Amino acid sequence: MMRTLITTHPLPLLLLPQQLLQLVQFQEVDTDFDFPEEDKKEEFEECLEKFFSTGPARPPTKEKVKRRVLIEPGMPLNHIEYCNHEIMGKNVYYKHRWVAEHYFLLMQYDELQKICYNRFVPCKNGIRKCNRSKGLVEGVYCNLTEAFEIPACKYESLYRKGYVLITCSWQNEMQKRIPHTINDLVEPPEHRSFLSEDGVFVISP
């Protein structure tokens, strides 16, 4: 069996120990969060899948969204090191690279899932359709400022309170629409404004 693997995938197997070491380094990061064993197993399997996979990434699961996006009260959301702490603590990366930006939301999963059934509005990039929350949500926007070899990175942390824009996908097993990605966390203008029929903020004169 091993001979077959080495013949079929010689280079990935040579690099695999380094990837496994990275995964171990992730788990050694000092964090206040204690992930269940099943979450750790899922992360390990996800790491292997990302390494060997040549196709598109599989849609995020409910548990992955809860683990990597949703947060609970703890560290102040306006803390300057919030993103550095949470990004590394929650192992937020894509194909062995740190993500350029990320959002953490202070809300429950059921509340986030309900947004999938709200009206469509333009996304931040103006291309895809997003669903927008009806109320304001607190969260943190993380912007990558310096990227080094995993697990080293630096993020700028920006507290926001605004309307969440998300994309959703259909989950066959659950027969429901579930959150896929967080597109933006739009802060309402400081002065008076209203939402047009397209869901776009219009500033009154």
Curated annotation (Swiss-Prot):
Pfam families the UniProt entry points to: RnaseA
Cysteine pairings via disulfide bonds: C116-C168, C123-C130
Tissue specificity note: At the mRNA level, widely expressed. At protein level, restricted to epididymis. Expressed in spermatozoa (sperm head and neck), with higher levels on ejaculated and epididymal sperm than on testicular sperm (at protein level). Expressed in the epithelial cells of the epididymal tubule (at protein level). Not detected in muscle.
Signal peptide region: 1-26
One GO MF term attached to the UniProt entry: nucleic acid binding
Subcellular location: Secreted
UniProt superkingdom: Eukaryota
Record carries keyword Disulfide bond: yes
Keyword Iron (UniProt): no
PANTHER family per record: INACTIVE RIBONUCLEASE-LIKE PROTEIN 9 (PTHR11437:SF14), RIBONUCLEASE (PTHR11437)
Its biological purpose: Does not exhibit any ribonuclease activity.
The protein, known as: Inactive ribonuclease-like protein 9
